[in-house]
C-alpha cells in the first residue's frame, strides 16, 4: 500500500492537471492536522508550486502577548512543504525548516504561504516560500530541505 491507500499494481499515472490537483487535495484535505486542528486551506496547486492559507483565530493562534504565535507560522510553513512535494509526485518529510520572521499579522486575519521548488533531486527537494499577511506584506521567508521517502505513483514529476 502507498500513502493515501493506493495499491501500486492498480495505479495509473494521471495526466490532466485538474485530476492531479484533485488527487493531491484528496490526499491532504482529510489530514487532521491541516483540516481539523489548523483549518489550513489549499488555495492553489501547480507543478512545483503551492499556495496555502489560514484564517487566524485569536483564541487559538496567539501567544501570551496576543500576537500570532511563531509556532503557528512554522506549522503553516511546514504544511505547505508536504503539499509542494506531492505536486511533483514525492512523499516528503522535513529535514530542515528555516524561517526568517519579518513581521507579524493581525490575529483574525488570513495569512498565506506561496511555495516553489528550487531543487528537485533524486533523494531531496528544496522548497523556498514566502508568507504574506492579508495586505500582501511579507511576513517571513522560508527555506525547507525535504527528504523524499516515497512517491505517489499516480502523480507525475512534471505536468
What kind of feature is each model-predicted range?
Residues 1-159:
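Terminal targeting signals and extreme-terminal segments of soluble enzymes
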Amino acid at each position: 500500500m502507498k500513502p493515501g491507500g493506493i495499491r501500486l499494481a492498480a495505479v495509473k499515472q494521471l495526466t490532466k492537471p485538474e485530476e492531479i490537483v484533485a488527487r493531491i487535495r484528496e490526499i491532504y484535505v482529510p489530514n487532521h492536522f491541516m483540516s481539523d486542528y489548523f483549518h489550513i486551506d489549499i488555495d492553489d496547486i501547480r507543478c512545483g508550486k503551492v499556495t496555502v492559507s489560514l484564517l487566524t483565530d485569536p483564541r487559538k493562534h496567539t501567544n501570551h502577548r496576543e500576537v500570532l504565535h511563531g509556532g503557528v507560522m512554522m506549522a503553516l510553513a511546514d504544511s505547505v512543504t508536504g503539499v509542494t512535494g506531492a505536486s511533483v509526485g514525492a512523499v516528503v518529510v522535513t529535514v530542515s525548516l528555516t524561517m526568517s520572521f519579518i513581521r507579524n499579522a493581525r490575529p483574525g486575519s488570513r495569512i498565506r504561504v506561496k511555495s516553489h521548488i528550487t531543487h528537485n533531486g533524486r533523494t531531496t527537494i528544496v522548497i523556498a516560500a514566502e508568507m504574506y499577511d492579508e495586505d500582501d506584506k511579507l511576513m517571513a521567508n522560508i527555506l525547507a530541505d525535504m527528504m523524499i521517502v516515497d512517491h505517489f505513483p499516480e502523480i507525475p514529476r512534471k505536468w
